[in-house]
């Protein structure tokens, strides 16, 4: 069977090796006579999966001991509410840096909980770039500062993070976690939905500084407290066991190929192929993001006319490319090239883009 060239924005491509491993164990996991989906979450077999996944994440990101790793549910969207519920103090401000639709949604949820502010925004440009760090405006009353590390819809990404000392720095890394080495100690809370770089949908990874868990959250419902899940090692209630198993296998795959430094080189190679096709097209393809803010995960571009865009997408589909439609707020096309997308898929897409350009220039 020929695998599709999968450029979906999420859920997205998974490494073939991981899928094959899951397939081989689907009916009989480690001689239990059961699928991992059938195991009790209190069994020693599942607990080994659970704790191995957490340790692999620690190893790959060099997570310090004063951080907890949590496996939650509800996606990044639930984190948009959990964060202000747990950390937005009365009389203080939740300060958000707006770089796209997902940071807007995070801000919207915080407004239900308390006072908010905008430290910086590039909305006026339709989010074509990441704001200059020196332009960000903080407040002595900030309860925390929040940013989104990569913007899937607009194709922009932070390449240098702001340094924040007056308040906790919280970051949504749903679409670029583990795509490159990460200075975890620079952040107080990192969260990421799994369905782009970590595995299938259904698991949310949270990396949280233990100091934040000491806060009084008696006003927060039990399931929405980070303390609840940290105290029970993410086993307070039934976790998404199969999703965590798949997460473990993706993390093991990443470790086997050399970790974040190796995957960062691979991701740069993939991005260079597609951005190269854009830059060499004499403005036939136009990138949405400015060059200095370009994402290594989501490449966004437009063609001269809507008719050409639809023809491009139609021909691409015939050739086995999936998920290249751009988001309606940007239009055009988008190639999401997360960790699980092989270099060969990006080579094939770049070749197709060159060919289409030569035909229709």
Swiss-Prot record:
Binds 1 pyridoxal phosphate per subunit. It is found in: Cytoplasm. Keywords: Amino-acid biosynthesis, Aminotransferase, Cytoplasm, Pyridoxal phosphate, Serine biosynthesis, Transferase. This is Phosphoserine aminotransferase. Homodimer. It comes from the Bacteria. Its cofactor is pyridoxal 5'-phosphate. GO terms for biological process: L-serine biosynthetic process. The gene is serC. Pyridoxal 5'-phosphate binds at residues 76-77, 102, 152, 172, 195, 237-238. Its EC number is 2.6.1.52. Belongs to the class-V pyridoxal-phosphate-dependent aminotransferase family. SerC subfamily. It comes from Halalkalibacterium halodurans (strain ATCC BAA-125 / DSM 18197 / FERM 7344 / JCM 9153 / C-125) (Bacillus halodurans). HAMAP family: SerC_aminotrans_5. L-glutamate binds at residue 42.
């Amino acid at each position: 069977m020929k695998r599709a060239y999968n450029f979906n924005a999420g859920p997205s491509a998974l490494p073939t090796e991981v899928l094959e491993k899951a397939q081989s164990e689907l009916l009989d996991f480690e001689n239990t006579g059961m699928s991992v989906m059938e195991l009790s979450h209190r069994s020693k077999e599942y607990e080994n999966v659970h704790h191995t996944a957490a340790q692999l994440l620690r190893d790959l990101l060099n997570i310090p001991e004063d951080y907890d790793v949590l496996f939650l549910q509800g996606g990044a969207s639930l984190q948009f509410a959990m964060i202000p519920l747990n950390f937005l103090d009365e009389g203080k401000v939740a300060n958000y840096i707006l770089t796209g639709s997902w940071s807007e949604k995070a801000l919207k949820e915080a407004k239900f909980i308390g006072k908010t502010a905008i430290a910086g925004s590039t909305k006026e440009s339709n989010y074509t770039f990441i704001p200059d760090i020196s332009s960000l405006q903080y407040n002595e009353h900030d309860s925390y500062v929040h940013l989104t590390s990569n913007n899937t819809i607009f194709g922009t990404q932070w390449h240098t993070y702001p340094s924040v000392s007056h308040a906790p720095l919280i970051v949504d890394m749903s679409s670029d976690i583990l795509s490159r080495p990460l200075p975890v100690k620079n952040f107080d809370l990192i969260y990421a939905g799994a369905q782009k770089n970590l595995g299938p949908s259904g698991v949310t990874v949270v990396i949280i500084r233990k100091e934040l868990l000491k806060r009084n959250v008696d006003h927060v419902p039990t399931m929405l407290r980070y303390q609840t899940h940290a105290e029970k090692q993410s086993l307070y209630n039934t976790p998404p066991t199969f999703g965590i198993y798949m997460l473990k296998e993706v993390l093991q795959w990443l470790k086997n190929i050399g970790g974040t430094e190796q995957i960062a080189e691979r991701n740069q190679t993939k991005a260079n192929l597609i951005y190269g096709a854009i830059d060499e097209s004499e403005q036939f393809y136009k990138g949405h993001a400015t060059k200095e803010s370009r994402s290594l995960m989501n490449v966004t571009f437009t063609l001269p006319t809507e008719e050409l865009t639809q023809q491009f997408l139609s021909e691409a589909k015939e050739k086995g490319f999936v998920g290249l439609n751009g988001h309606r707020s940007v239009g055009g096309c988008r190639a999401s090239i997360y960790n699980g997308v092989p270099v060969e898929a990006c080579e094939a897409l770049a070749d197709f883009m060159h060919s289409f350009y030569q035909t229709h220039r």
